[in-house]
Amino acid sequence: MDLRAGRFDGQMTDDAAQFSSSIEFDKRIFKSDIKCNRAHTTMLIEEGIIPKESGKKILKALDKLEKEGIGALNLDPSFEDIHMALEDYVTKEIGDEAGFMHTAKSRNDQVCTDIRLTLKEEIENTISNIKSFIKTIVEMAKENTHTLFIAYTHLQHAQPTTFAHHLMAYANELRRDCERLIDTYKRVDMNPLGSAALTTTGFPINRERTTELLGFSKVMDNSIDGVSSRDFAAEAIFDYAMLSTTLGKISDEIVIWSSYEFRMVECSNQYSSTSSIMPQKKNPDIAELSRGKSTIAYGELMTVLSMIKGIPHSYNRDLQEVTPHLWNAIDNTNDILRIVHGMLSTLTINKDRTEELAGANFATATELADVMVREKNLPFRTAHRIVGRVVSEAIDDNITTHDIDNDYVNRVSVEVMGKPINLGEDLVKQALNPLRNVKSRTVIGGCAPEAVNDAIEKMEIFLNE
């Protein structure tokens, strides 16, 4: 079948045909193209637009192709795209009657329909995989509500928390990634089929019927928009880029925590490698690669935004180049999601080390200041100055949190405000105890076991929706 025969004499040069062909990345939409042609042909038959017997032959050929798979197509670049390769197959099966299949349809609306159908499936799969990862995280959190952990700001000791509390931060980030995809899905789930080249068609087609057959939620309201819009693709890539960001942050923390200096976690051997020269090494290569690969979706997003920003309505061949970047962003991010899920779920927590760090380097200092406010009605800024001086002098005196007592705090408070604060030994020791710190954070979102358990319950409601 020669699409050029009516308008042109001769063929494209081989290099021009190869340059303009989308056959290779069109393989991704093969199944959707069959669905699209099947729905369109069914509608044409029902509306009496094409001969019923010809339509039945087309549908039979499409069913046969679906069973045989993409290997049955001639994927020569001279066909330009999967649509013409598919039409060539049907033509070889039933002859010229195959031409009825393209009645009231253009490749412009056909490819948009195929991309949307395929992207819907991709988003559904990713949402399912994110929820599976969140479920794993929630189960890990349930087991670690009392596992002391150190939280950082600026990668410096900040305050004690629990490993469960930190895990639930991951879960909530992933939930938002999931919700973004759910929201984007609404804008993908629209049917452009029937837009034809750009102004619809003079045939009395039934767009609501193809919408029903293809499982879309609505018909696109404007045919020019139907064939020219790729904002849904850019939006989806953004969602995958944000998901990559979450996964990259998790990977980054695994790299840091697994170092000898931190020794908070250990990666499974399944997700580690060694050195070709240093036999003692256990390197978090998979975490590092996940962190590095998490940037790929950013590049794909910028590429697609650049492609679609400066072209006029409606269809332009530039748009052909959007889809490989869309699929690459999706595939790469899904790979990272699968790897990080497995890596985190097999992580070993060094609980002795995390408990040690939770109480080290004056991480409980904030609670000491808070106790001064609660027990002595001291302005927080005054308490902040006293505790800051306590820490500074303790460092100068080469003592740790465990060595700070009521007398030490009184001496410093005299220096700061001219009188002892007299908290008492019990209050000072309780304030500086990391476990007591954690248990006092009972507000919504806090690190106390009951607060984390509440957060887990909320997350499980989301997972079951």
Curated annotation (Swiss-Prot):
Biological process terms in GO annotation: arginine biosynthetic process via ornithine; L-arginine biosynthetic process
Pathway the protein takes part in: Amino-acid biosynthesis; L-arginine biosynthesis; L-arginine from L-ornithine and carbamoyl phosphate: step 3/3
Gene Ontology CC terms: cytosol
Pfam families associated with the record: ASL_C2, Lyase_1
Swiss-Prot/TrEMBL catalytic activity: 2-(N(omega)-L-arginino)succinate = fumarate + L-arginine
Entry-linked CDD domains: Argininosuccinate_lyase
Subcellular localization: Cytoplasm
Enzyme Commission code(s) on record: 4.3.2.1
Residue stretches in coiled coil: none
GO molecular-function terms, A-Z: argininosuccinate lyase activity
UniProt keyword annotation of Amino-acid biosynthesis present: yes
Keyword Chloroplast applies: no
Gene3D superfamilies per the UniProt record, alphabetical: Fumarase/aspartase (C-terminal domain), Fumarase/aspartase (Central domain), Fumarase/aspartase (N-terminal domain)
Keyword entries, A-Z: Amino-acid biosynthesis, Arginine biosynthesis, Cytoplasm, Lyase
HAMAP family reported in the protein's UniProt record: Arg_succ_lyase
NCBIfam families: argH
PANTHER family: ARGININOSUCCINATE LYASE (PTHR43814:SF1)
Family: Belongs to the lyase 1 family. Argininosuccinate lyase subfamily.
Name of the molecule in the record: Argininosuccinate lyase
Species of the source: Methanosphaera stadtmanae (strain ATCC 43021 / DSM 3091 / JCM 11832 / MCB-3)
